[in-house]
Amino acid sequence: MYNINIQEITIIRNRKPAMKDVNQELQWFGGSLGLFNLRDRDKSCFRIFVEMVKSARERQALSSDELAARASLSRGTVIHHLQKLMKAGIIVHERNTYILRVDNMRSLIDEIEKDLDRTLSDLRDVAGQIDRELYN
């Protein structure tokens, strides 16, 4: 497990896919985390995300060049999406390679939940401090 600070994550509540197709479920999963949008017409971020999930299962970190080859994308496109995935706290950069933050999807959600809990706790503390200053 890696220690990271999530800078930005979006949670979107969507209907779960009716079919039990792993690609649809991965698309829904990543979409619910705000990773994919309409601008990603060729599903490049999704393709990179899938490769990162596969590499996590194999416990193998990948370079941007390896990801570009696996996903049939330019290195520039890969790096753009890797930065987005890092900013969301989904992947980490380690020794010129990238890897999913944890080795499975459930653990990823557990880690994001812990990050959100810490952030909400900080917000609650500051809100209490603001209330005391405003109302005393």
Per-range role (PLM):
Residues 40-60:
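Short helix->loop/beta-hairpin flanking segments within DNA-binding domains
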Residues 86-97:
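A short, conserved structural fragment
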Residues 107-136:
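Amphipathic alpha-helical dimerization/coiled-coil segments
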Residues 1-39:
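N-terminal leader segment of winged-helix/HTH proteins
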